[in-house]
Amino acid sequence: RAQGKYIFFFDSDDTLAPDTVKSIIDYFDTVYDEVDLVTYRITQYFKNAPPVYHFRYRTLTHTGVYDLDDPKNRFITQTNVNICVKNDKNNGIFFDESPGFRHEDEKYCCDILRRKMKIGFCQKGEYRYNRNNENSIVSTVFSPYYIFETSMAFYEELFNSFGGRVPPYFQGIVFNDLRWKLKEDKLLPYHYSPEEFARANRRI
């Protein structure tokens, strides 16, 4: 079990910029009572291609605390492990380890953020996401054959958990997932029968 004040997460084939840990900790200390999670820039690196940045950085333009109840922040959509969280042993929030779930990072962030509906962002530091691994989860099992039903069930459960109006931020979470899967042709379950495919489209 982690013993420090904060927890960082890190995938084995990714790297951090040298100043990342100190920069994030120094900033988190200044907003400790306001937020439970601080995010920082994630950059996708592909072989022989320019770095790719998520559209959330059109909103996250400066170091500070962002109100997730404000509709203009609905596309921050924190879904990856480029985060630092408090080492709170009593909050009861853990990664969902259900076999084949594939949304564990996203759900973990949602569970933490919905408590205060605020997120901290530090401009310093960088999570360097290696997209060159052809054997990664995203490259191998992030296809509708494996995750369409799981993804839909997760988002239906997420929306239902609000018992009515869904905050724009969480609507943005779903929009983000649909957007990138459509772009990479990983959304629609083409392997379904025509009847099942039509039903799946209505469900989306």
Report residues per predicted region:
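Conserved nucleotide-sugar donor-binding
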Residues: 3-4, 78-93
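Active-site acidic Asp-centered loop
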Residues: 10-12, 96
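A recurrent flexible, glycine/aromatic-enriched loop bordering the glycosyltransferase active site
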Residues: 62-85
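Nucleotide-sugar-dependent glycosyltransferase catalytic core
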Residues: 99-101, 121-153, 184-198
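Terminal low-complexity segments of carbohydrate-biosynthetic enzymes
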Residues: 164-168, 173-204
